[in-house]
Amino acid sequence: MYTKQSSAKIQELKSPALSIKIGYLDDDFRIFSLVSEEEREFQPHYHSFHKLLFFESGNVSYYVEGETYELQPFDLVLVPAGEVHRPVIHSSLPYRRLILYLSPAFFEAYKKESVDLFHSFSLCSARASHVLRFSDLLESRLYTPLQELSQ
């Protein structure tokens, strides 16, 4: 649950001295599945690329830029490049997710006057909501093709 106290803690974590840049991306995109089966603490961090995370299972909160989201299966988390984020795993249940990294150059290469693939990421900051909630896999038409690509 998001509280003023957790907001203050997140603002503290967003300090450049306390958040680190991690990960790298040598191509336009990278897609993979991850499972964390033990409790693990993730440090606040950011990337130079955009991150799309499909949450599959676990008991996880996700912090992005001062907001806390209690994830539910099939949630889609959008994290634009440069935004501080981290998951918090609340139990030893396996934390399963499908991750897609996208370079800023990827979006630029496909940008046209009538089409802006980056639009969904742009809305995150404007609406202060980084999670799209789907009730099932059928509602999320992106999940199945991405899962197939990750194998």
Predicted regions and their residues:
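N-terminal regulatory/effector-sensing and dimerization cores
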Residues: D28-L123
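A hydrophobic/aromatic-rich effector-binding and dimerization subdomain
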Residues: Y2-R30, V88-S150
